[in-house]
Every structure is written in C-alpha cells, then in structure tokens.
Swiss-Prot record:
InterPro entries: Helicase_ATP-bd, Helicase_C-like, P-loop_NTPase, SEC_C_motif, SecA, SecA_CS, SecA_DEAD, SecA_motor_DEAD. The keyword Endoplasmic reticulum does not apply. This is Protein translocase subunit SecA. It is found in: Cell inner membrane; Cytoplasm. Monomer and homodimer. Part of the essential Sec protein translocation apparatus which comprises SecA, SecYEG and auxiliary proteins SecDF-YajC and YidC.
Length: 908
C-alpha cells in the first residue's frame, strides 16, 4: 500500500523514464519544420555528415535527435508515413539497451527503422532479428526503400544462402534475418577452415522483434550442429582384417634387443605401439589392399586419418576383451564399467574405438551422431555489444529480461487511447458446454457483422472447432502454426465484416488485422492499378471499416487459457489496435488443462453446489484471479528451468569462448611457431616429470621408460642412461634442458629439410585439426557429464558445484591433450613438400563435406541433464488426472514417490 502511495506521488519508474525521453522527442519535433525544407539531396547527405561527426569523436546520443528527425522526414517522403511521438519514444528505448513494450498495431516495424539507422551509422552492422523467414523478407523489403534513400544497404540472412551471399548480407549496413540463422552462422564461423570462410562480422547491435518469443519461449532450446561422419563401416571392416596378421612383441626394441614382433603393449597406459618392422608390415598390407599408394607412408601428412583407424583397430584387438571391458548383447557392443562391473548402455568410446570393437565382433557398425557445435540463444545474444528488443507483451516477463539479459523493460504508451473491452472469463463445467457457448457467441457476432478471431492453444482444438462450424454451416478460415504467405493474407483480411478466423495462438503474429480488411493488399493484387481503381478500393474499404466499427470492432474469442499470461495478452492484443473498437473474452471449462491441474475439485464442487445447470457459466473476478495465480505458478516454474539451464550452459559457454577465441587467433595468425615452441617445452617437461619426478633422488628415476616414451611419442632416440653414466654432474634440471634442446634441434632439422613456410602452414593445419577433434570429443564428454550429474545429489553433493568442478577438470584435460597430441604429430609426421600440406587440407575438407550436418534445436532437458532441482521441477510438471480421486496422503500419481499433498496436491 505504501509503495502504491509513493508511485502516485512520484510516478512509476516507467513514467520517469518516459519523461526523460520526452525531452528528446520535443527536440526532434522542433527540427521537423527545418528538415521539411531540405531537398532530397540535402536530406540524403545527412548520412555522410553523421558518419563524419562520429569519426571525429561524437557519440550516438549527441546525434540521436537529428538522426531520428532525418529518418522521420525520409519516411514521410518515401512511405508517406510519419513516425508518431510514441514511435520516437520506442526508438529511443531500443537504442538504450532496453526492451520496448509496444501494443499490437503501434507500428513496431516502422519504429525499428529509427535505432537501426542510428546504429548503422557506426559502420559496424545492425542485425534486425525476426521469428521466421517470411517476416525477415517482408520487413527487409518493406524498409529497403527508406534505408536506400538514406544511403544505407540492406541484407537478408535466411537459410539456404551460399557463402558469398551470406557475406554480402552481413556486410550490409542493416541485416534482417531469423534468430536460428544468426545463431547457426556464429557456430559455422567457428568451424571454418580459413578466415575467408567466416561470414559474420563482430557482433555489434541486435534488435529483436517479438523479443519475448525468442529470448524467453525459445531460450530453453539450444542450437546444435551435429553430424554423423560418412558411413566408414567398410573402412573399419577392411582394417579389422589386417590385425590378425600382426604379431605381438614382449618388449620395446633397443640397442641390446631387436625383436621380431610388430607391436608392443603398454598395459599400464592402455596403449599399443608399432615397431619399425610392424609399421612396414602394415604399410605393405594396406598397399596390397589398395588402401595406400605404392611408396606412400602411413605417417605421411595426408594419412593421419588412416593411422587413427589402424591404431583404433589394434587397440580393439589387443587391449579390449569381450565380457571384461564390454559385452555383446542384441547385436550391440555395450561398455562394462571397469569399477562397478555394470553395463553402460548408450555410452560409446571415442576416437573410433567403439566402431573398431564393433568391426572386431562382427556386429553392425554404428555411426555416431556427434555434436560439432552448440549454443543457447541466451548465450548467443549476450555476445552482442548492444542488445534491444520489442514486443507487444513484455511487462509480465520484465524480471526475467532484467535478471538474465540485463535488459530493462519500458512500456511505451499507445498513440491513441485503448478502447478495447476485455470481458471477464466465462467458466463452464464441461468442454462440450464451452464449445456450444463459443458457437453461439460466433453466430451472434456474425449477425451483427462483427469479425471474430478465435484463438486456440493447439491445432487439434482448432480442427475440432472447425468441424463444429462446418456442422453449423458457419463460413470460416483456419490457420495452423505453420507460417507462410497465404497465412499473412488470411490474417490481414480477418477484420472484414462477419469474418470468422480460427488460429492457434501464435499463428499470424507480425501481421496487423485491419478493420474492414487490408485495402493495401487488394491494391497490390492488381497489375498497374489506376488512380480510379485505388480510390474505389479505398472507398469500399471505408464503408466496410465503418460497418465493422459500428458492430463493435474485432472480437477476440479465447477457447482456453494458456499457461502463460503473456500468450493470452498477445491474443487479446490482436484487437483494439490504434484506438480501434474491439472486445475480448475467454471461454473456459473445468476440463481445460490449466483448470484441471490448478483449479482442483473444490472449484467444480462449488459450481455444482451453486446448482448450476448445463450450459450455465460462472463469471466472477475471484475465478479470474485464481486462474491468474495458477498462471503465475507455471511462469515461475518455467523461469526456474530457464535459469537453471543458463547456470549449466554458462560453464560450457566460458569454455566455448576460450576455444573459439583460440581458434580464431590460430586462423588469423601468419605463424604459430612461438606457440609451438612454448607448448613443446610444456609437453616434453610433463613427460619427463612422469619418469623423473622433480627434486627426486636418482634411484627413483625410470630412465629406460623415459627413453622408450620419448622414442615412441616424439621420435627422439636419446642415450639418456649413457649420458648419466658418463657425466656425474648431469643433474635433473640440466638433463631436462638437454632433452628439450634435442627435440628443438630435431625439429629445426625437419624445418630445414621441408622449408619454414611449409612447416608453418603444416603447424597451423595440425593445431586446428587436433583442436577441432578434441573439442568435439569434449562436447560429447560434457553431454555425458551433464546427463548423470544429478546423481551426485544422492552423495550429498551439490550437482551444480560438481558439474563446474568436473567440467573444469575435463577442460584442463582437453588443453593438456591438445598440447601433447600436436607435438606428438609434428614429431612423427613426415612432410616432404607444400603439396603434402595441401593434400592434408584437401582430405580434411573432403571429410568435412561428407559430414551429414544436422541443424537442430535440442530438447532443453538434454542440455540440462538432471539437477538437485529436478524434484522441484517434477513437482510442478502438469499432470492429467484420469483415474479415481487421489487422497491427500496417497502416493502422488506423477511417480515422484512423495505424498500427493507434498507434490501435485500443493497446487490444488
């Protein structure tokens, strides 16, 4: 009460914000007379003038009033449309990292031209984001004449464009497109092979239309690029046949011992290594089978992939034993947990090992559908330097916009007072009674000539109503959720006299319903219309418009309450645009999902006690309040889920940004020789530490093991034991330096042989290829971690903290493995000439082209996995009760294991 009193005296925060912005509106209005006197050329020259001032150090705020006045004047000349003062207010809100709530019909598309023009003057690009391709194309084409008049370029970014078309779209001053396409382009850019393949510029300013739909409704669905590599089962099968020809050797070759085997096994490290004899034998076998060219080496740059396959097959045969490490069940290889002995269905080994085991066992080889890249909309849009959005319904979600995106919501007043009548809900006992009442209301409206828009929550419900209308011989149009051009036409004509249109709640969003029908569309349908034809169409429309207004304007009829108040408000907002007449009413029944879950038996019991007969409805503010409270509960639950998703994804997002930044630096750098030098010191030192622990006595050193490891992994054949025997003063630190220097000398010799430029290019190619491969494996490991993390709760641990800790360990592992693998490959692989590097790049591109990429929205639940909040979420999950009444102390039918009163009964 005290808060309401303060608001009355000082005004709300929204009022104070608008009051501050009104001063700038007054400035823009004061400039209007002067700008009207400018010629077209003088008005167009304003763009160059503003750009010069910005280059000289002026701020966008300092030129805002003049820039907005320029756009308003240009719009009057190009479109014969003048921005209202409220649209100027909306434009200023959108320029200041806020969300503008503007009612339906207030001209959001025209409002967006103001901040889009202002921010495009910086030359950094503006992205105007819509919910579908149709709206992106429509808005871009509608506004193109205005922007081009002012000397700006417009691009359209939709699915299916070629790389150059994408680049052109992004290089435009203002780019229209869908949220999905912008997100996927970001992911694709971070999978590019060269800087020339990237299409996006740095993310500067995003202006999101229908911001609630994109940042809230779709926030839980991450964008994922996944792909199954080409079907390489034939390759696994062929390589599998080579392994039985190979002979095991008990110990590594040395000066004292030269074995006759083909490979050795390091059981401790679970690794196998070819002997020189074995390498030659495998190469000969591959040449015999036509898998390797005559004279080619398995260790040449172009054959890295083949080498991986051979190693995987050898490991499958020698290190992994059936009924110990895995079992074969129903034609599938299932991993056995080495610690618990339990099977782990659904889990697969990486690096091609699982497929190699499948080939060994003769079962069907499955291609993994691997996540190549992923991001949530929440984290994608937070990458922009500036972010703003507009919608007709944001105020109910203002807290979420502020909490997650740091965006304040400002409710922009309507240009004309709202006169729509929002009538109280009518609640019936059964769905059948409700539908009969809806049909009666539609018939009454048709008799008066009043158009009706019937909003349903599902396609199934819209089809049911359509069948009832056919039965009653009521002419109507049905729209489902699939948006296409025809739908826009139907929605545009839904305001004609006596028209009846059934639409799912979201269908047709973005198209205004004009009372009397859309006369512009009628004119557009004619080829070269004469002024007389235009005048007749407009006169006919005026008669229809007046008749519809006299009948009460557009009547919105809701057939069920949505679980979100915002969606209900969107439906209501289709009527009463620009001060038009209109009305709205929701028809509900006790069988509706929301009522059945939340309103409980008490309400229907009360309705029966009131002696309500069939067909009678209850209409009371108390019922409307109860429904609103139910909706608040659902909204709160959904907010918790989105917040939880973000907390989990933030961990992955930090890692994603580190990897992508590193990748971009790699691609843009001319040489990464210094990086290679630094990591080789780290890698060799780490290997030495395993065999010669720092500051340890010589008795603890495993010198033969170190010699063997350096030879196997880095092709360094060093007589370390001999050095130690001959030089008494050779201590740990000087030995370390000598080994590192030996690697550097060997690498320099390789550089002199192949040439510095070839090796620099090869280093980049190896580093990128290794990083990409490990990142894909890391994403899979993160998925597995996320799916099982909620089980940590049973051990009295906080799943979120455990997820952060374990994912950090996985990331550290990724970085260490990256360093090790890059140095190992650079040590082993033989590069003869530039053509080897080019061949390696060509193979890599070929393999990438074979990936059947799948651009998809993942289920949010898969991204979250489980958590300590799972039970709380489960307790709020809508449940349909279709059996006997559940007692308060009975187990809840949802399966949570709790008593009904402590679970879904809480909501009754």
């Amino acid at each position: 009460m005290f808060g309401k009193l303060l608001t009355k005296v000082f005004g709300s925060r929204n009022d104070r914000t608008l009051k501050g912005l009104q001063k700038v509106v007054n400035k823009i209005n004061a400039l209007e007379a002067d700008y009207e006197k400018l010629t077209d050329e003088q008005l167009k020259a304003k763009t160059a003038e503003f750009r010069e001032r910005l280059a000289a150090g002026a701020s966008l705020d300092s030129i805002m009033a003049e820039a907005f006045a320029t756009v308003r004047e240009a719009s009057k000349r190009v479109f014969e449309m003048r921005h209202f003062d409220v649209q100027l207010l909306g434009g200023m809100v959108l320029d200041s990292n806020r969300i503008a709530e503007m009612r339906t019909g207030e001209g959001k598309t025209l409002t967006a031209t103001l901040p889009a023009y202002l921010n495009a003057l910086t030359g950094k690009g503006v992205h105007v984001i819509t919910v579908n391709d149709y709206l992106a194309r429509r808005d871009a084409e509608n506004n193109r004449p205005l922007f081009e008049f002012l000397g700006l370029t417009v691009g359209i970014n939709v699915a299916g464009l070629g790389q150059q078309d994408k680049k052109d779209a992004y290089n435009a001053d203002i780019t229209y497109g869908t949220n999905n396409e912008f997100g996927f382009d970001y992911l694709r850019d971070n999978m590019a092979f060269s800087p020339q393949e990237r299409v996006q510029r740095p993310l500067h300013y995003a202006l999101i239309d229908e911001v609630d739909s994109i940042l809230i409704d779709e926030a839980r669905t991450p964008l994922i690029i996944s792909g199954a590599a080409e079907d390489s089962s034939e390759l696994y099968i062929k390589i599998n046949t080579l392994i039985p020809n190979l002979i095991r050797q008990d110990k590594e070759d040395s000066e004292e011992y030269v074995g006759e085997g083909d490979y050795t096994i390091d059981e401790k490290a679970k690794q196998v290594h070819f002997t020189e004899r074995g390498q030659e034998k495998v190469e000969n076998l591959l040449i015999e089978r036509g898998m390797l060219a005559e004279g080619d080496s398995l260790y040449s740059a172009a054959n890295i992939s083949l080498l991986h396959h051979v190693n995987a097959a050898l490991r499958a045969h020698t290190l992994f034993e059936r009924d110990v490490d895995y079992i074969v069940q129903d034609g599938e290889v299932i991993i056995v947990d080495e610690h618990t002995g339990r099977t782990m269905p659904g889990r697969r080994w990486s690096e091609g090992l699982h497929q190699a085991v499948e080939a060994k066992e003769g079962v069907r080889i499955q291609n993994e559908n691997q996540t190549l890249a992923s991001i949530t909309f929440q984290n994608y849009f937070r990458l922009y330097e500036k972010l703003a959005g507009m919608t007709g319904t944001a105020d109910t979600e203002a807290f979420e916009f502020q909490h997650i995106y740091g965006l304040d919501t400002v409710v922009v007043p309507t240009n004309r007072p709202m006169v729509r009548k929002d009538m109280a809900d009518l609640v019936y006992l059964t769905a059948n009674e409700k539908y009969q009442a809806i049909i009666k209301d539609i018939k009454d409206c048709r008799e008066r000539g009043q158009p009706v828009l019937v909003g349903t929550v599902s396609i199934e419900q819209s089809e049911l109503l359509a069948r009832l209308m056919v039965k009653e011989k009521i002419p109507h149009q049905v729209l489902n959720a699939k948006f296409h051009e025809k739908e826009a036409e139907i929605v545009a004509q839904a305001g004609r006299t006596g028209a009846v249109t059934i639409a799912t709640n979201m269908a047709g969003r973005g198209t205004d319903i004009v009372l009397g029908g859309n006369w512009n569309m009628e004119i557009d349908a004619l080829e070269n219309p004469t002024p007389e034809q235009k005048a007749k169409i407009k006169a006919d429309w005026q008669l229809r418009h007046d008749a519809v207004v006299a009948a009460g304007g557009l009547h919105i009829l809701g057939t069920e309450r949505h679980e979100s108040r915002r969606i209900d408000n969107q439906l209501r907002g289709r009527a009463g645009r620009q001060g038009d007449a209109g009305s709205s009413r929701f028809y509900l029944s006790m069988e509706d999902s929301l009522m059945r879950i939340f309103a409980s038996d008490r309400v229907s019991g009360m309705m029966k006690k009131l002696g309500m007969e069939e067909g009678e409805a209850i209409e009371h503010p108390w019922v409307s309040r109860a429904i609103e409270n139910a909706q608040r509960k659902v909204e709160a639950r959904n907010f918790d889920i989105r917040k939880q998703l973000l907390e989990f994804d933030d961990v992955a997002n930090d890692q994603r940004q580190v990897v992508y930044a590193q990748r971009n630096e790699l691609m843009d750098a001319e040489s990464i020789a210094d990086t290679i030098q630094n990591i080789q010191d780290d890698v060799i030192s780490a290997v030495i530490d395993q065999y010669i622990p720092p500051q340890s006595v010589e008795e603890l050193w495993d010198v033969p093991g170190l010699e063997q490891r350096l030879h196997q992994e880095f092709m360094l054949k060093l007589p370390i034991q001999e050095w130690l025997d001959k030089e008494d003063d050779l201590h740990e630190e000087s030995l370390r330096e000598r080994i590192i220097t030996s690697w550097s000398d060997a690498y320099k010799a390789k550089e002199e042989m192949v040439g510095a430029s070839v090796l620099r290019q090869f280093e980049k190619a190896v580093m990128l290829q290794t990083l990409d491969g490990l990142w894909k494996e890391h994403l899979a490991a993160m998925d597995h971690l996320r799916q099982g993390i909620h089980l940590r709760g049973y051990a009295q641990k906080n799943p979120k903290q455990e997820y952060k800790r374990e994912s950090f360990e996985l990331f550290q592992q990724l970085l260490n493995t990256l360093k090790h693998d890059v140095i190992s490959v650079l040590s082993k692989v033989q590069v003869q000439a530039q053509s080897d590097v080019e061949e390696m790049e060509a193979r890599r591109r070929e393999e990438d082209a074979k990936i059947q990429r799948d651009y998809q929205h993942a289920a949010a639940e898969a991204l979250v996995g489980g958590s300590d909040e799972d039970d709380a979420i489960a307790a709020h999950t809508p449940m349909i009760r279709d059996g006997d009444k559940v007692g308060r102390n009975d187990p809840c039918p949802c399966g949570s294991g709790r008593k009904y009163k402590q679970c879904h009964g809480k909501l009754s």
